[in-house]
Amino acid sequence: MTNYNGLIVITGPSGVGKGTLVKKLLLENPEIWLSISATTRTPREGEINGKDYFFLNKKEFIDLVDKEGFLEWAEFAGNFYGTPRAQAQEKISVGKKVLLEIELDGARQVRKTFPEGFQIFIAPPSFEELEKRIRTRGTDSELAIQSRLNRAKEELLAKNEFDAIVINDQLDIALLEIKKLIKS
């Protein structure tokens, strides 16, 4: 059993299975609340404000940054993305577990802004297996694959910064390990 204050951060390289693990974890544990990110990008068709994202204009977003209103935030492709602090703290204050599935840089920011959170790094069984998974997706160009793999090498070097490392070799075993880690 892990002692933490309700905030769970899951990160790891692209292709490691974070998204799949998080989806299964949420399905089996409806008491866990997945944090909704804020963004300045334009909503895509069918996206709902407050459900898919909190859609903000750049001024609103920067105002929140200035007021330390995000646990973490970043700019990507000309838009801002961030995890609103208030909604996470509100859920935690009423005893809910809050889950963030974020990138390495965001996890590092959260460690500074909310150090009592529990951070889990999802790792592949090997770099070769990670490459195989990324290539098997069939969605990326060779250039994009190489970019993901180079980024993954950097991210894997950071795994010891985390409270726990879960190797996603077999999905069900990795999921069970995560559930044991966050059980309170």
From Swiss-Prot:
Enzyme Commission number, as recorded: 2.7.4.8
Top-level EC class as recorded in UniProt: transferase
InterPro entries in alphabetical order: GK/Ca_channel_bsu, Guanylate_kin-like_dom, Guanylate_kinase, Guanylate_kinase_CS, P-loop_NTPase
Residue span, Guanylate kinase-like domain: 5-183
Subcellular localization: Cytoplasm
Keyword Transit peptide: no
Binding-site residues, ATP: G12, P13, S14, G15, V16, G17, K18, G19
PROSITE patterns per UniProt: GUANYLATE_KINASE_1 (PS00856), GUANYLATE_KINASE_2 (PS50052)
Coiled-coil spans in chain: none
Biological role stated in the UniProt entry: Essential for recycling GMP and indirectly, cGMP.
Family of the protein in this entry: Belongs to the guanylate kinase family.
Annotated protein name in UniProt: Guanylate kinase
Organism for this UniProt entry: Prochlorococcus marinus (strain SARG / CCMP1375 / SS120)
